[in-house]
């Protein structure tokens, strides 16, 4: 028993290994991006690295890397190890070039994504259990109360006000591909509803900036719909910081 525990401990120790890694993210059915990065550390069951594209806890990424064979849980004879990974931790930080970057911690979940991900890439997941077959993490779809701030967001003060903002959409390279000056329908510390003519699918990430103060936050699109008035709206959840409400009411 002691020997098995020691082996399990060794397997889960992080190994500092700066291997190149190709990161694929399907933000929505119609949009994906690829970014090259380097590992900070790795175990057979997860890894850490840094990317410049926004993402969020609960999303799935596909990693491709020349993983040492002794650290693999499958595909031991393939040159490249292609593994799906769940974002467990995300820390935004300012890079030396002034650009925002994200330190990501992921858990490896297997060779293939869940069927629900194929249908809806914006689906968010949580860890459910460990596979007895390969010791990788098994997933289930996250419930509303488990997705970051969803539960507390519903209790947040939501101000019904037309706050002047700009909405920016990113392309596959992370550059701004479209933008629009508009106003909010309502706003809270954790999210907002904005009127916009931009065509942005659920699951995409956008930047929302106050045209009055210059305050800028990254947000995930939770829904895109038209209200009873026929005007299209985006329902946004802020993912990197909160929006201060002081002085707005």
Which residue ranges define each predicted feature?
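Structured alpha-helical
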Residues: 1-249
């Amino acid at each position: 028993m002691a020997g098995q525990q020691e082996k399990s401990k060794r397997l889960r120790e992080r190994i500092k290994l700066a291997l190149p890694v190709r990161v694929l993210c399907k933000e929505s059915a119609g949009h994906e991006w690829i970014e090259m990065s380097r590992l900070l550390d790795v175990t057979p069951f997860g890894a850490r690295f840094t990317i410049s594209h926004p993402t969020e806890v609960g999303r799935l990424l596909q990693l491709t890397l020349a993983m040492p064979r002794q650290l693999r849980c499958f595909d031991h004879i393939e040159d490249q190890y292609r593994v799906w990974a769940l974002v467990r931790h995300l820390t935004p930080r300012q890079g030396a070039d002034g650009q925002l970057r994200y330190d990501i911690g992921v858990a490896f979940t297997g060779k293939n994504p869940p069927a629900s991900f194929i249908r809806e890439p914006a689906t968010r997941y949580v860890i459910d259990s460990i596979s007895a077959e390969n010791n990788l993490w098994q997933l289930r779809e996250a419930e509303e109360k488990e997705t970051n701030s969803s539960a507390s967001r519903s209790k947040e003060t939501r101000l019904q006000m037309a706050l002047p903002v700009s909405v920016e959409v990113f392309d596959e390279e992370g550059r701004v591909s479209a933008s629009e000056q508009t106003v909010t329908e309502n706003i809270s510390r954790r999210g907002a509803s904005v009127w916009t003519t931009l065509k942005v699918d659920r699951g995409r990430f956008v930047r929302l900036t106050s045209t009055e103060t210059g305050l800028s936050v990254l947000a995930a699109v939770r829904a895109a719909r038209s209200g009873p008035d026929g005007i299209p709206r985006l329902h946004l959840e802020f993912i990197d910081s909160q929006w201060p409400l002081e002085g707005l009411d």
